[in-house]
Every structure is written in structure tokens, then in C-alpha cells.
Amino acid sequence: MRLKLILFALLSILIINNSQAQYKISIEIKDNKDTMLILGNYYLSGTFAIDTAYSKKPGKFIFQKKDKHLENGIYFFANTTGRYSEFVIDNESNFTITTNEEDWAKHIKSKGSKSNSLYFEYMNNNFVFSDKVGELNKERANMTKEAYEMAVNNLRLRSDTLKEEFLKNNPNHLLSKVLIATKEIKIPEINPIYKNDGSLDSTAMQLERYNYYVNHYFDNVDLQFDGLLRTPRAVFYDYYNKYWDEVMKFQPIDSIFKYANIVIDKSRGSKQMFKYLVHDITERYLKSHVMGHDEIYVRMIKKYYESGEANWMKPSDLDKEIERANKWEKLSRGKVVPDIQCPDTNDIVHSLYSLNSKYKILIFWAYDCGHCSTEIPKLYNFYKENKDVYNVEVMAVNSGMDLKQWREFIVKKGLNWLNVNGLVANYDWHSYFDISSTPYIVILDKDNRIIAKKISAENIPNFIKYYDQGLIKL
């Protein structure tokens, strides 16, 4: 008897799992003549086709899979000409959608899906408001400015009331998550801040507003709801990217990493959202060309991947990322580079550490590198003009194989700084500095600590100027 109960329990689990891992969505379009419809969904910045259905009877289509589960989000069915209509998957996967060929969106209804019935009702009410605004615009020429604005405001108030009622009555509906996520953050009124002379400090007040915005940016976004990943890009994707690309653009490295952790922590109730955020932020700063952003990548790998929290990566790929992070960590700003010893054009060995200057510019380059042919002369002009101004010395390390061409390039361009042959060195600097392209430029202080790297020649003058003035900190 006990064995029978166990078998029955196992069978029940299998049936439940099977019912959860399938979908059946019937589409019925009156007077429709299409032979095929496409089922698609939104994901981040794109749209994706995930299924097709062919009509066995005019206007009747069935999307069905017994081995696939549809995640929560906004989906759509479309014909081959691009006409489409949206619906939601909100913990329901077996229902029927009916509509009319005349206007798919305005006639759409649902059977067997309470979530879609609510969604369609809300959207259709909004269509009514949109139509009325359109009618007002047509009549605008025959109305006074006051009458037109009053009519539009009344419609807007009714639309806002409709939204608030929906949110109140359906707080857990997918559409509610979307509507809340698209609400702008309202910055409260900032108390006046005064300077020592009694005048209003508008800069300090603006900073207060900015700090509030940074700290409350995601207040309306439920980062524990992964359904937001499968919505039109304007709902989540664009808003999320704006945070890193614009709001946090000029923040120091420590602040960016701090807020990255805060945002990620908000997603810990959702495996999918957590995975997306950790992966995106890590990749974002791996690929960034902004100096110092590689340090964020290193910290992300250490905190989430090496610790085992990000457990979705293949072991071989994980090992490569950790190896790269360990290598890049040694190249972080403030780290001391090992001494480089190479022979010059006369085979006299020189040491990086022997350069006695306030700043040292270490350049890895090649005479046959197209980018080097433009960057090296720019850098040399800076060197000539500012060598004594900032007490700067240069070690230019050659990576080209033809030493004759290397020497000819030096003479032709008049590069009167320390030129050394990197093919003969005391260690594998190419691997140590993880050089993938040239020129690769590193700026060091007198103690051989990295203060800048992967910096272009045209940005060096301002960097050294501001660093020397104490306006740039490590």
C-alpha cells in the first residue's frame, strides 16, 4: 500500500510538471484569410519569433507545445506582413484569444485567461481615450485654446484615474508591474543650501537632486520580477541602460561598483533577473573603453563569479574569466609594474626603474602599426613640449620583428627619447600587460605605480596636467 502511495505521488508530480511545461494558445480571428501566424515575444532590446501556427480552418490558429514553458511577459501574434497584436503571459498558458479582422487590437477578447481579459479591457479603454484625443485635435481649429486644453486635461485625468484603479485592483498583474516601472521618479523639493557668504548654493542643491535620483532610480522597477525582461524595450531595457550610460557616466569607479551591488541585491528574488544583471554589468565594464572601468570588471568577477554566486558559466569559461581578472588586477591603477629591461638601438640595456622622473610614459608599439604611425608623433610632440614642464620621461618599447625598419622609423620621425627593443626583455611584458593592440600606453608615477593606462596620445596632455594639479585622483 505504501509503495502504491509513493508511485501515485510521483505520477502526480509528473502530471503537474507536464502541465506547467506546456502551452496551448488558440487564436480566432473572424473574417481572417491568413494561412500562418507567428507567436513572438519581447526580450530586452529585441523581438523574437518562438512558434508558428497554420490555419486548418479560416481564421483559426493554435500555438501549442508540450515541452515548452512560456515565461511571464508581453507576447504577440503576427502575420507575415507585420500586422500584430499583443497579449500577456502572466502565469497562464492555456487560453483562447478572439478578435475581428477589421481591427485586431480593438476587438480583442480572451477566454480562459483572467490576466488577458483585464489587460485587453484596460488597453481598449485607453484606445477610447486616444480616439477622443484624435477627435479633439481635428476640432482644435474650431476651439478656443482654453477649451481645448481643458478637454485634453479632462481626458488625461480620466486616463490617470483608470490607471490608478487598475493598479489598486490588480497589484500583482504583469501590466501593473509595467505601468509602475514606467513612472518617472519624482525628486522632492530640496531645502535651500547656502554658501558661507549667504548666497544660494545652486550647485550643492543640484548635487542633492542628482544624489536622490541616483539612489531612487529603480524605486518603481520591481527587479525581482523577471517578466520585465520580456517587455518592449522602452519599459525596462532602455531605462536600465540609461542608468549606466547617462546617470552613472561620470561616477568614480568605487561608486559605480557600489551601486552595481545595490542594484543586483534588489534582484536576488529572481534567478533570471539576477543572472541578467550580473552578466550585463560584468560584460559592460569588460568592453568599456573608459579608463579604469576594467577595475569594475575585475571586482565583478571576484565577487560574483569566483565566489560561485554566478554559477551558470561553464567551468572552462569561468577559469578563463578568473585568469583574465587576476591578470588585470595586477594592472589596476596604483599597482607597481615590474621593471622592464631592454636594449636600445645600440644594444645598451636600459631599465624602466632607472628613469629618474616624476612621470614615466611606457609605450608598447610597432613601426608597422597603422595607428602607431599617427599616435607616436602626437605623443612625441607632447614629450618635446612638456618634458621639462612636468618632468616626464618615455620608454618606447618596440614589438616589431624587423629591427632595421624599427631604427629607420625612429630616425625618420626624429624620436629622441628612450627607444628599446622589446623582443629582448627580462620578462614577457606582452603577456603581463595583456596587450591585444598597439600602441598600448601606460603612465606611471616616480614610484612606477600605474596612474593611467590604455590612454590615447591626444588625452595624455590634459590627463597629466590635471593629475599634476591634483584634480585627478587614483
Residue spans for each PLM region:
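N-terminal "domain-start" segment that seeds a small globular fold
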Residues: 313-352, 462-472
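Structured, charged N-terminal subsegments at the starts of enzyme catalytic cores
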Residues: 206, 214-268, 272, 278
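Bacterial Sec-dependent N-terminal signal peptides
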Residues: 1-28, 474
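A non-transmembrane, solvent-exposed segment enriched in polar/low-complexity residues
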Residues: 22-171, 178-182, 186-227
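Structural microenvironment flanking redox-active thiols in thiol-disulfide oxidoreductases
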Residues: 374-411, 425-431
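Non-catalytic, surface beta->alpha helical segment in thiol-disulfide oxidoreductase systems
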Residues: 78, 437-440, 446-474
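Short active-site neighborhood of thiol/selenol oxidoreductases, capturing the structured segment around
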Residues: 350-379, 393-395
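Short, internal strand/loop/helix patches
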Residues: 410-442, 446
